[in-house]
Design a protein with these regions (language model features):
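Short acidic alpha-helix that forms the nucleotide-activated donor recognition element
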Residues: 66-72, 235-237, 256
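ALDH superfamily catalytic-core signature
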Residues: 43, 84-229, 247, 251-252, ...
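Cytochrome P450 core scaffold surrounding the K-helix E-X-X-R motif
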Residues: 7, 231-235
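Glycine-rich nucleotide-phosphate-binding loops and adjacent flexible coil segments
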Residues: 241
């Protein structure tokens, strides 16, 4: 749901170039994007005298998705979403000896060395953590900071978070928009609770915003938590604006921490 048009575009365009047709099952959380793109495709197809059926859409929840994963006429399934979803899709498609392309979760970190330009680093870490309200597989989840500069980074970042403006993402003055739905909000709240129960120290408090402009109940405050890399909650991706801070002393230790999670990494 976070990049609904882009995900469709980079998958379907390649398939068309190779002479294949596509059936697109959009996220049930962003179905109108699929309809809008299909309308554009229909115009292009009509202008170029292309037959119907090259691009098709179906909308619905996971039960509709199961129709695709189990259909032996569909030789390749490309799926973007959670790691949990990927395990199900990959196994189901493999049962019929089909092929799957899976773009799943990420648990990305930034390693901050003593030589780093902290002003540039803070901007990058801030955008990486709160951009799209933390709802990207490429979002920054962890900051691995050298012990010599840990306090300085912590203080500068906490100060920067206090300047964030939360609201309608169509307003260019705002930095952070909403989470996708109430389920995502509950996951966000449970993640904070879990981090604290494991020993985490909350530096920048979270919470759900209320009042004018926040009637949906999906606008939340970005959070910073001091944590350890081995915490269960840190080891698993949370699709929300929660950033974990941790220390290192030697670069080899930092690299081990960076790689020491189950999900993939972006750079």
């Amino acid at each position: 749901f976070n990049f609904p048009v882009a995900v469709w575009n980079w998958n379907s365009a390649l398939a068309w170039i190779c002479g294949d047709t596509c059936v697109w099952k959009a996220s049930e959380k962003a179905p109108l994007c699929a309809i809008a793109c299909q309308n554009i495709w229909n115009e292009v197809a009509n202008e170029n005298n292309l037959p119907e059926g090259i691009s098709c859409i179906i909308n619905g929840d996971y039960r509709v998705g199961e129709l695709i994963t189990k259909d032996e006429r569909i030789s390749l399934v490309s799926a973007t979403g959670s790691t949990r979803m990927g395990r199900i899709v990959g196994a189901e498609v493999a049962k019929r000896f089909g092929k799957s392309l899976l773009e799943l979760g990420g648990n990305n970190a930034i390693i901050i060395t003593p030589e780093a330009d902290l002003d540039v680093t803070i901007i990058g870490a801030l955008f990486g953590a709160v951009g799209t309200c933390g709802q990207r597989c490429t979002s920054t989840r962890r900051l691995i900071i050298h012990e010599k500069i840990y306090e300085e980074v912590k203080n500068k970042l906490s100060s920067a978070y206090k300047q964030l403006k939360i609201g309608n993402p169509l307003d260019e003055k705002n930095h952070v928009g909403p989470l996708i739905d109430k389920d995502a909000v509950n996951t966000y709240l449970k993640a904070i609770e879990k981090a604290v129960s494991e020993g985490g120290n909350v530096l920048v408090e979270g919470g759900v915003l209320t009042g004018e402009g926040f009637e949906s109940g999906c606008y939340v405050k970005p959070v910073i938590i001091e944590a350890e890399n081995y915490y269960e909650i840190v080891q698993d991706e949370t699709f929300a604006p929660i950033l974990y801070l941790m220390k290192y002393s030697e670069i080899e230790e930092a690299i081990d921490m960076q790689n020491g999670v189950k999900q993939g990494l972006s750079s």
